[in-house]
Structures are given as structure tokens and as C-alpha cells.
Amino acid sequence: MNVPLILAGSLAILGAGIHWVAGEVLVVRKLSPGMLPSSRFGGPVMTKTMIHAAWHMTTIAFLTVGSALLLSGSVLHGDMARGIGLLAAGASTGFAAVAVGLGAAYARSPRSLLRHPAPAVLTATAALAWWGAL
């Protein structure tokens, strides 16, 4: 049993669940097609559809990585556990880098990075994943 990987996986799965439900209710449903631009793929409704699909693809990515971390820390053993743990730690790092990087790029102050839990949760998940994988 690898406690850091289990914690990282549990955190990622919890985050995926929150991303799915809160994102659907608080973000996607509130997008008004009338306020969205058209794209070369179609009108505002198609833009909303693409945002909706991308949102839930991201949720599935979080769930997949979380499941891999959880399995690596609990059920899998040896080289298989290490390899999958390293891959999932790398993916977790990518998620954290995007959240922190884009958050910092658009932040008006360092404090605004703390308004949304994603940068901190994704960074904690990545740190736990690397701790457990190495």
C-alpha cells in the first residue's frame, strides 16, 4: 500500500466529481448562447456544445488519472504500479501547470489565485503523486 498515491488518487477523484457537478451547474448551464461567438464550426449553440464537451472531457481526464493513482497505490504492484504511477504523476503535473500558469497569467494579484481551489488542489495532487511514485 502506497499512502501518498492513494491520497493523490482520492483527491483527483474527488476533484473530478466536483468539477463534473459544480461545472455543469455553475458554469456550463449558465452559458448563454446569445453571449457566445460563432466559430467556423457553427453558431453560438455549437460554441456552447464544444465548451460543454471539453468541460466533461476534462472531468473524465481527472477521473482517469485519479483512478490510475488509486490503483497504483492499492492494487497494482512492482513495475506496473511504478510505471502507471509515474504516468499519472506526469499528467497531474500537467493539470497543475495549466491551472497555475493560466491563473497567474490572468491574475490581477497573487491573492486572486487563491479564490478558486483548482491550482492548490491540482498542485497538492501532483506533489502527492510524485512523492508516491518516486
State where each predicted segment sits.
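Polytopic alpha-helical membrane-helix bundles and their juxtamembrane interface segments
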Residues: 3, 29-33, 72, 123-131
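Membrane-helix boundary connector in multi-pass membrane proteins
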Residues: 97-115, 129-134
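Membrane-water interface of alpha-helical transmembrane segments
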Residues: 2-9, 45-55, 78, 82-89, ...
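N-terminal signal-anchor transmembrane alpha helix
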Residues: 2-25
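Juxtamembrane helix-break-helix junctions at the cytosolic face
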Residues: 66-85, 103-107
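Core segments of alpha-helical transmembrane spans in multipass integral membrane proteins
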Residues: 10, 22, 26, 30-74, ...
